[in-house]
């Protein structure tokens, strides 16, 4: 896949970063007066180009035989290592060791954290990326930063080639003991600001069996400030978690603090899919499509243009009205706080 020209991305980042950034304490949510429709007013990148998530459908897919299986290094973490699990008011986030790395990318990327996006108990459509319009129950993001060029996540988050995220789609199925190593601690992080210690485990077990079967494209953070600095690798086959595990995800957590007189459930914390003009998605597979992907056949790619029309929110898509979290945090707290 042709990489996003570094000079172009650097120019885009420079133009926006010359504008005053929102101060700490700016609010954002998924609906309501601070919802995603008004994100661009406070966070200009959210109304810009190369935005994520997107829908994967055949007319934007291009088979790339040069794509190699994702290789993991250091993902089997000793139980003596402790991960910090945090409710940051937008999601539940677990810090990871920088000794965890991914290979077969243009740069070396080291792990920083993972977090989840999900729906609600009445409508389990919580993934951010979709396949031919199909949502999955939830989505796990494992966030890595370019450790060849930057010292940490904070310094890489707004830079060209700064981040690489592995996205794992999740669907209802069998009980998943690996995800339970995280989910079993939810009672200790029910409210915003609460933390828990999770013993190390084999994080590889959170990923699908095949690491050579994925979509790849240049995109952005899916939360404010939406920097277009992410190389996305979205695995095609979802992993299974049980009904009970999904319910724990959808019913246990709050986006408010424990003493808030009006507690708000943390549900529907996913961004709607964005327009995908003048870009291509490279795929590592040519076999029959996964369920919901459409008919098999040759993938067609759009030419990568040099002009980028203003992005539009996809029509016909709605965000559930049950989520109304308004949080006063750092502008990119889902990644760094």
Where is each model-derived feature located?
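Alpha-carbonic anhydrase
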Residues: 1-337
């Amino acid at each position: 896949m042709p990489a996003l020209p570094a000079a172009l991305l650097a120019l885009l980042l420079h133009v926006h970063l010359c504008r005053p950034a929102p101060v700490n304490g700016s609010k954002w949510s998924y609906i309501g007066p601070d919802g995603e429709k008004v994100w661009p007013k406070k966070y200009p990148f959210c109304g810009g180009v190369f935005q994520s998530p997107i829908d994967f459908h055949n007319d934007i897919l291009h088979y790339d035989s040069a794509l190699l299986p994702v290789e993991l290094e250091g993902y089997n973490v000793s139980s003596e290592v402790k991960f910090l699990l945090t409710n940051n008011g937008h999601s539940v986030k677990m810090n990871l060791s920088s000794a965890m790395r991914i290979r077969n990318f243009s740069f070396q990327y080291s792990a920083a954290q993972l977090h989840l996006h999900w729906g609600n108990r009445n409508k389990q459509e919580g993934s951010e990326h979709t396949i031919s319009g199909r949502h999955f129950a939830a989505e796990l993001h494992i966030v890595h930063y370019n450790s060849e060029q930057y010292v940490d996540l904070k310094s890489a988050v707004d830079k060209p080639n700064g981040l690489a995220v592995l996205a794992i789609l999740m669907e209802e199925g069998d009980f998943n003991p690996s995800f339970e190593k995280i989910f079993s601690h939810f009672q200790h992080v029910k409210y915003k600001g609460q933390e828990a210690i999770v013993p190390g485990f084999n994080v590889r077990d959170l990923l699908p069996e095949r690491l050579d079967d994925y979509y790849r494209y240049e995109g952005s953070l899916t939360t404010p400030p939406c920097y277009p600095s992410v190389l996305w690798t979205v695995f095609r086959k979802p992993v299974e978690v049980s009904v009970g595990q999904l319910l724990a995800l959808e019913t246990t957590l709050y986006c408010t603090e424990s003493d808030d007189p009006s507690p708000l459930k943390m549900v529907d914390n996913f961004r709607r899919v964005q327009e995908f003009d003048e870009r291509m998605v490279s795929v590592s597979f040519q076999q029959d499509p996964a369920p919901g992907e459409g008919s098999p056949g040759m993938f067609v790619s759009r030419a990568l243009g040099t002009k980028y029309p203003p992005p539009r929110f996809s029509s016909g898509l709605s965000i559930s009205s049950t989520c109304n979290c308004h949080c006063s945090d750092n502008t990119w707290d889902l990644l760094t706080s």
